Amino acid sequence: MAEAPPRRLGLGPPPGDAPRAELVALTAVQSEQGEAGGGGSPRRLGLLGSPLPPGAPLPGPGSGSGSACGGQRSSAAQKRYRRLQNWVYNVLERPRGWAFVYHVFIFLLVFSCLVLSVLSTIQEHQELANECLLILEFVMIVVFGLEYIIRVWSAGCCCRYRGWQGRFRFARKPFCVIDFIVFVASVAVIAAGTQGNIFATSALRSMRFLQILRMVRMDRRGGTWKLLGSVVYAHSKELITAWYIGFLVLIFASFLVYLAEKDANSDFSSYADSLWWGTITLTTIGYGDKTPHTWLGRVLAAGFALLGISFFALPAGILGSGFALKVQEQHRQKHFEKRRMPAANLIQAAWRLYSTDTSRAYLTATWYYYDSILPSFRELALLFEHIQRARNGGLRPLEVRRAPVPDGAPSRYPPVATCHRPGSASFCPGESSRMGIKDRIRISSSQKRTGPSKQHLAPPPIPTSPSSEQVGEASSPSKVQKSWSFNDRTRFRASLRLKPRCSAEEGPSEEVAEEKSYQCELTVDDVMPAVKTVIRSVRILKFLVAKRKFKETLRPYDVKDVIEQYSAGHLDMLGRIKSLQARVDQIVGRGPGDRKTREKGDKGPSDTEAVDEISMMGRVVKVEKQVQSIEHKLDLLLGFYSRCLRSGTSASLGTVQVPLFDPDITSDYHSPVDHEDISVSAQTLSISRSVSTNMD
């Protein structure tokens, strides 16, 4: 029964459209799997695994419906809209690079309005300044009005400012409120000035100085105010102390000078006049409108001036030092932020070096990464084919094989195999199959497991491109079924494995003869270890470079960093010394004068013995006790033996009293022969000797 030829794709993608070709291939494979799994209608799935509706068209060039095309166009327009909105918001709220040009232009406009507002108060330049200011105000209204509207619109790129409620929340920000107030005041001034209203020359003229608020809006992000607030908050206790003492000095100085000068000096007729004098004097302004006349008042003023000025000047020094420390801290923070990228690169390089180890074959992410960036090996196959054509006199390998060769004529060059031998992954010139590194690793590992006999019987599956030529299985015995994987991102790229092309004219005997006679020169098993070695060497070099760059960023920034490094090293050294001391105490054993023993009190005998058994000194003492016990027992045995020798008779042997062995209570060693057993054996020996004597 002849097998049905493989189904071709109805919608072939163009050669240069790789993403759409991948989409078509995935859809076709899903449909084939659905037909093979169930006998009913195929159930097609999308790229994310969600089932497609039954009436959904097959994705391909020209096959999409009008609604789908309209949806794609609307999605693209939405992306462009969001991108433009985000770009405008960054230009207005977070300017960088050339965006500062616009903000400098706005600053010049605001500064020009401020200068003209000042000149409009001078009688000589009032008319010219008012005319120029009127024109500039029109320009400012247009610019600020458009900018305010664009700011509110571009705020929609942030999630919290989307929708009407989000826009209203953005409009309630302090700087937006200032912009709105200045805009309304400018419109009111221009409207009243153009109508020639007399009221505009009196009441609305003062509204022009609301333009001073425009200078506040120059710092949209409030960096200066945040810096000042952080410095004041960091040194709040010192500032409160200095201000409190200065205020007390001001009150006492003003009151005492008022008591001394109120009768003799009309300038100090009230306590308020004295407070004014004290404020001007202690702040070192010194207008000179009020001065003490009496000697008592002058002495008090001099004493309190020397004491109070120092406290009034303290906040300036505190704020100055705080600003200096804050700037230094910001520089240090920037220096530390420069370490993030080298540290991340070092971690990534270390992990990739770890994952490329040959003993960790289960880590495949790094191999997938290099599989996506490795160059195509199709040029290598073309180079082999070009060399063979040059050796064959300009003919292709198939033409050389089909050309008749006279009998007995020697061949100039050895023939080159052009067909794929089953069971071997080899490079043969022909049609290339697009196969990734992970598939080649899987095939090579399966070949090593199955062995040469099984490899010869069952050729490894080689995935082929759907857009390539499909040859029927009836005409091509070496046809290999398609093997697709949804995670295979490299199936449309040339690879190391090249598929041969065998014509139908060749017989089976010729194929077998060629398989037995010739072998391909380059195999995947030969190339893949070399590629892995090269990749691992590259990972080692990248790891060393990342390590060197990270060490360069660890250089100390200033003296404070050096002190911190020394203190950290000192703490580390103390910890190591403490650990070493604990180990020495454990080896030698803790004596009676140990500090912990004195602090926690005396331990029980069981605890002391347990501690002694752990320490080396306790073990040495235990061995010494056992040796003493053995020596004592040996002395007793030698004494018993010497008495037996001196008596010389068996009767004396029975009369000799065997000394009892006192077991050493302090020793853990006990002899397997007890002293009772020794006495019993001695009595048995004496009885046996007496019996033998009587028999004689």
From Swiss-Prot:
GO terms for biological process: inner ear morphogenesis; potassium ion transport; sensory perception of sound. Residues 592-606 have a biased composition (Basic and acidic residues). Residues 547-651 are annotated as: C-terminal assembly domain (tetramerization). Residues 1-97, 154-169, 225-236, 324-696 are cytoplasmic. Residues 610-645 form a coiled coil. A 1,2-diacyl-sn-glycero-3-phospho-(1D-myo-inositol-4,5-bisphosphate) 2 binds at R221, S236, H331, K334. A 1,2-diacyl-sn-glycero-3-phospho-(1D-myo-inositol-4,5-bisphosphate) 1 binds at R94, K173, R220, R221, K226. Residues 465-484 have a biased composition (Polar residues). Residues 272-293 dip into the membrane without crossing it. Residues 343-352, 536-550 are annotated as: Interaction with CALM. GO terms for cellular component: basal plasma membrane; membrane; monoatomic ion channel complex; plasma membrane. Two molecules of phosphatidylinositol-4,5-bisphosphate (PIP2-I and PIP2-II) are essential to activate KCNQ4 channel by inducing the coupling of the voltage-sensing domain (VSD) and the pore-forming domain (PD). Upon channel activation, PIP2-I and PIP2-II disrupt the VSD-calmodulin/CALM interaction, causing the release of CALM from the VSD which triggers the opening of the gate. Calcium suppresses KCNQ4 channel current through calcium-bound CALM C-terminus. Therefore CALM acts as calcium sensor that controls channel activity. Its main location: membrane. It is a multi-pass membrane protein. InterPro entries: Ion_trans_dom, K_chnl_volt-dep_KCNQ, K_chnl_volt-dep_KCNQ_C. The chain crosses the membrane at residues 98-119, 131-153, 170-192, 204-224, 237-259, 295-323. It catalyses: K(+)(in) = K(+)(out). GO terms for molecular function: voltage-gated potassium channel activity. Residues 120-130, 193-203, 260-271, 294 are extracellular. It comes from the Eukaryota. The keyword Transmembrane applies. Homotetramer. Interacts (via C-terminus) with calmodulin; forms a heterooctameric structure (with 4:4 KCNQ1:CALM stoichiometry); the interaction is calcium-independent, constitutive, participates in the proper assembly of a functional channel. The interaction with calcium-free CALM controls channel trafficking whereas interaction with calcium-bound CALM regulates channel gating. May form a functional heteromultimeric channel with KCNQ3. Interacts with HSP90AB1; promotes cell surface expression of KCNQ4. Belongs to the potassium channel family. KQT (TC 1.A.1.15) subfamily. Kv7.4/KCNQ4 sub-subfamily. Each channel subunit contains six transmembrane segments (S1-S6) with S1-S4 forming one voltage sensing domain (VSD) and S5-S6 contributing to form one quarter of an interlocking pore-forming domain (PD). The CALM binding domains correspond to the first two membrane-proximal helical regions that interact with a single calmodulin/CALM molecule forming a clamp-like structure. CALM N-terminus binds to the second helix in both calcium-free and calcium-bound forms and regulates channel trafficking. CALM C-terminus binds to the first helice in calcium-free form; this interaction is disrupted by calcium binding which regulates channel electrophysiological activity. This is Potassium voltage-gated channel subfamily KQT member 4. It comes from Mus musculus (Mouse).
